[in-house]
């Protein structure tokens, strides 16, 4: 696994005239090496691949990063990096500009002299966009866990509970069934708070005759799922039923037509144009979707301005919504993988308008 990814990374490095890359991002480190420890760095040259870590992980690291030379780094990791580069006669080092703070860059530049630091962006992230078969298996399991969590919470949630109580039950259920944790701060937004696209769970007490939006996911074996469903407890305002049906129509239309070769803006328009047709375009203020993988928000983007080209193996969300301040909102989201001819849906929770008893 790791070796194949390193070979692809080297191809990308050669295209950018990069002889050595210093990987500081924890996500990219795990993607390349498989190492899950909390501290470490990856150094990749055109001939060698090193995992640099400290004493605490010198047993774990060789077990996980089997295709890497594991090195216990000096108190200052830059001393070890400098030594390894000198032995390979390399005097330029690329670093991840999107991960390294200015303070860290300043320290690296001083400590690594006379090695020249070169900022690069997206070398590893571009590899992560296309998922291989093993990654897709893990992501399907993460999606399955999100589905089972939603099914569980339908039998748990009741009026009189706080949103936070529901959030904690969802977190406990996902962890009990194999998740490391939730893949992001769970959104449980009830009543008028459902008009907040990112209304994370609060101490609000769930009442009757209102909507609840659940937006959540599981982080499982390093990969995220991301599922949104909106339900009712008791009969809500008829206007909310109306916008539910519009959002569902938009989402189903997008799922039916998203395919490889399409741009992110074209995919976005599939859902957005339907919502606009019904007069709610101004109440759908976020993108239709985003890439999903080791992070919950990755490329490609399904938005009004996105020129990203959808390709087989990409995993994206499809999540249109309508939000009416003071009344409530609806969002419906699934995870899909782009296939050779269209897409396959990974999440399968019911999208029928569900009304639970008060």
Show which residues each predicted segment covers.
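Active-site neighborhoods and metal-handling regions in enzymes and metal-associated proteins
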Residues: 1-358
